[in-house]
């Protein structure tokens, strides 16, 4: 019988730059998941890693640039927050979430326990900025205001793969166990209403399964077999993380079969040139298809 277990580690202590995160994880695992075992996948929310690495910002201490002031006027976003977005990466797209909520309010009302609170948070964040951070599109560039004190926010770790590697090394020193570490962050889904946790950093696990073209049950090469394992374990851990006051920022996934690797999430991202070529080819092929569709009506 194949089985995978997920243990959520509840952490009630305040976490800051003085916290020894690997030791804290090991101590909590002893009490809540029978310790750390070989081949465990330790999934950690990015917010916790950001707090330890000093990536929490006090908004009134940020000096906005002229560019940030300029954009903030058009997008009703505090210039300090706008400055952080611009620092994190290049803004690729802007989603007018408040306008969409005004037009399709029933979608938001169906998935909230407090209509008043939902309206308040949308007023505070009327636009979602999709920002290219190391070849990955992240909402607001990973800048997050939740579970931070008023007037504060957190940015994702500067180098999530390196953060995952360091934590993995420290866990190995403390326990003698070989594990994998994945750092997860919450992202809005663009194809349906809702959010899901995705991996922004990893160490010790092959991020993408290497089975493209492998034979299926009928012996035919399959167009597929490239599961995004780090995203899958992040989404699985999110079942226990929650999004509000669960105080469960770490999960241990046990029993998962995976290929060990020193590669990280950044290694699995599409190169920028591939992005540009894909868009160009997409546009050209769609123009071609539209023209052929018109011609097919003539013949």
Language-model regions: role of each:
Residues 1-299:
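N-terminal and secondary-structure boundary signal
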